[in-house]
Structures are given as C-alpha cells and as structure tokens.
Amino acid sequence: ATYPGEGHRAERMSFTIPFSMVDEYDMPWLVAGSGLNDNQYAGLSTLLRRFFRDYGDDGTYREFLTFLDDPALQEELHESGRVHEATYDAVKRRVRAVPGGVFDGDAVPITDLDHTLVRPGGLSVIPTYHLPTSRQKEIVVLAVSSMLVGDKLSNDPRSDRIKQTPLLIGMDEAHNFLADADTVQARQVVSTFTEAAKQGRKERLGLFLITQDPQDIADPVFKQVNTTVVLNLGDEEAIQSVNIPTALAGKVPYMQKGQMVVYSPDNSEPVEL
C-alpha cells in the first residue's frame, strides 16, 4: 500500500517488515494471526525453526510458503511425532492467510532503520490508515512496537541505538492491538507489553496507550498504567474501566474540548483540568 503523505511536510520514508523478524525477535505469532491453539502454535514454532535453520537469516515469507508445500517434510514431521498432519495443515492455512505485501516488500527493512526511527529528541510516526485490512495494520504495528520493546528490555539488543535512547511508544487505537483474548497469540502479545509496562521505567521506556475503549485493553497491561488521562467518553463501561471517583466520572460524558481528568494513583488524587 502507498501512503499519500498529504497535508504535511515531514520527511517520509518507506519501509517493509522483513520476514526474518519472526526469527530475530522470536515472534511466531506475527504470522499466526488469531485462532491457533497451543498445539498448532507449537507446530508453527517448530516449522519456523526448521525453516530458518535451512534457509538462513534471510529466509523470506514466499520461501516459507514454498517450504510448507513440501509433502515429504509434512510426512517426516508427522511420523516423528513432532507435528501431526492435521496440525501441519492448520498452520499452513493460517500462514497463507497473511495479506500480501506485508512482508519483504520493495523498501528498506525496518530493522535497518533503527537510527532513523529512533533519534534523541526526534519524533517518528508510523501511519496505518492507508493499509487496506485490519490484519495488515496489526502486523505492522505489532512488528515495529515489539522490535522497540524487545531491544529495550533485552540484555543483548540487536540495536544499541534503541537500547540507549529514552523512548516513549505511543499506540493509537490500542484496544485493537492489546485486547484480551483466549488465544496463544494474544497471550504472547499481552505478555510482551505487560513486561514492557512493568520494566520499562528501568530501561527509560514509556508506553502511551490511546483508546476510546479502555475496557477492551487486556487487564495485565491496563493495570500497569501509572497515569490515566480521561477525555470525553460516552460509554458507561469505558468510564467505569478507568476507575475514577464517581463525582468525576459523572462529568466525563459532558466534557468539552480541552477538559480532562488526570489520575495517577501513585502520585496524587484525581484532578479535573
């Protein structure tokens, strides 16, 4: 997809998500989407390890599809008891459902742009509104943010620039990416960002989650949020989820532009501004 870039004069740079990130940053869930059970996820992990062992760090998504089409491989893994044939087929269907154009596009890999993406005093924006499907948006947002979080929390980061630079990651429509769900993929994603919220302060990493549906953000992540800024919300469930005093909660649906409630339980009482 092409980003039009209208309405601003900021420098623009195209990038692609290299399939190798799945291996480099241990993110099998990036190609799994939703719906894999524990056995299928384990099967996917086995297949990815075998693929990158055979094809090297530069293995591509298209090569992985070709790799999965090998009936001899499927038979070998089934007979050895490592991946049941039905599990293999389920993984294959899920991997093939990844929208085209997400991986290995004709642009610079995002992993090679760490010094452009992260700059002391700089601001980088990753727009996704031009991407045609929610699955494409999900892959791009989670790939980039997980790369940043992974290097920040790692003792052996791939990028020293990311590791050493104080960083605030803002995620718009966060409920679309950090929702609680009973799938192994969702648990992996939520675990990553829960750890980021817990440990981020030590590594000079902050998470700034923006949402109209705070009640849909997974509890393990939401409970780690230290400061909440509440603007106008109309949904009763959303208002209840931000846990502010009743007197202030009653004002939230009627707040005008510029009005807000700021609540930082560790630092102060809720304040209306």
Segments from the language model and where they lie:
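P-loop NTPase motor domains
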Residues: 1-195, 202, 260-267
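Conserved ATP-driven motor cores of ASCE-family P-loop NTPases powering translocation/secretion/packaging/pilus
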Residues: 194-273
